[in-house]
């Protein structure tokens, strides 16, 4: 075994020399013990830790906390296998949740709202529907219950300064992949990407993580958020109704080779936004979005 670390080599030399002076016949056994000890030390330093989540195999993750943020939406916190584990999910990618419901294996994709470098856990924001499958299953979870998850997966992976500007249009929990990207951009002083976000909801109470979004827009001039409500309260200063062409023209970057528009939300909304953006001169949205696409739907 070659000892490349000078301190390790020196310590080993002292041990071997001492053994020789006390009992020369024991030298081979002491040398073997020294070699085995340092082999274990070096192995611990170089061993690669197994990722807590696998892209192909579903694994179980225990629910440790549940916080409601609107009447039908909650944040679900799941523990990773070890306290020092990191999910290390690429920015813009998601995980798959699978459950057996009425004898059928059903899966849905979700993007964690927690950061990929949060230690020991990940958080999912889920809106539950009475007729939903996976979303209803989440609403029935109790602390200590487990889910089956695998990942990462997805065609989008954000890298700093990948384009000059990003326009985002999301509805409800479609916020989650956008939030990942927004956080990554504003916390990196070298990332100069401009971000404009149109966030649509039914009522003001439905706006998920509004306090964080408002704070980010106040602290970081490169990020702007525009809220749209179907049912707006009196005195509301944001958009009212459905996201339309005029809102997109005012709040999104104009079509150009160095911009992207990201869409995420209920299927009818994404379909409507795909048509409006194409009518405004953006590229046509492909059935399955790929990273190079100008308009990408999650």
UniProtKB/Swiss-Prot annotation:
Q: Name the UniProt key words of this record, in alphabetical order.
A: FAD, Flavoprotein, Membrane, Mitochondrion, Mitochondrion outer membrane, NAD, Oxidoreductase, Transferase, Transmembrane, Transmembrane helix
Q: Which residue ranges run through the membrane?
A: 14-34
The primary location reported for this protein is mitochondrion
Swiss-Prot/TrEMBL catalytic activity: 2 Fe(III)-[cytochrome b5] + NADH = 2 Fe(II)-[cytochrome b5] + NAD(+) + H(+); 2 Fe(3+)-[Dph3] + NADH = 2 Fe(2+)-[Dph3] + NAD(+) + H(+)
Q: Which GO terms describe its molecular function?
A: cytochrome-b5 reductase activity, acting on NAD(P)H; NADH dehydrogenase activity; transferase activity
- List where in the cell it is found: Mitochondrion outer membrane
* Highest taxon listed in the record's lineage: Eukaryota
InterPro entries given in the database record? CBR-like, Cbr1-like_FAD-bd_dom, FAD-bd_FR_type, Flavoprot_Pyr_Nucl_cyt_Rdtase, FNR_nucleotide-bd, OxRdtase_FAD/NAD-bd, Riboflavin_synthase-like_b-brl
A single Gene Ontology CC annotation of this entry is: mitochondrial outer membrane
User: Which positions bind FAD?
Assistant: 139-154, 165-197
Q: Domain FAD-binding FR-type: where?
A: 56-159
Q: How does it sit in the membrane?
A: Single-pass membrane protein
Q: Which GO terms describe its biological process?
A: protein histidyl modification to diphthamide; tRNA wobble base 5-methoxycarbonylmethyl-2-thiouridinylation
What PROSITE patterns does this protein's entry cite? FAD_FR
Functional note: NADH-dependent reductase for DPH3 and cytochrome b5. Required for the first step of diphthamide biosynthesis, a post-translational modification of histidine which occurs in elongation factor 2. DPH1 and DPH2 transfer a 3-amino-3-carboxypropyl (ACP) group from S-adenosyl-L-methionine (SAM) to a histidine residue, the reaction is assisted by a reduction system comprising DPH3 and a NADH-dependent reductase, predominantly CBR1. By reducing DPH3, also involved in the formation of the tRNA wobble base modification mcm5s 2U (5-methoxycarbonylmethyl-2-thiouridine), mediated by the elongator complex.
- Quaternary organization: Monomer. Component of the 2-(3-amino-3-carboxypropyl)histidine synthase complex composed of DPH1, DPH2, DPH3 and a NADH-dependent reductase, predominantly CBR1.
Q: Which family does it belong to?
A: Belongs to the flavoprotein pyridine nucleotide cytochrome reductase family.
Please report the name of this protein according to its UniProt entry.
Answer: NADH-cytochrome b5 reductase 1
Give the gene that encodes this protein. CBR1
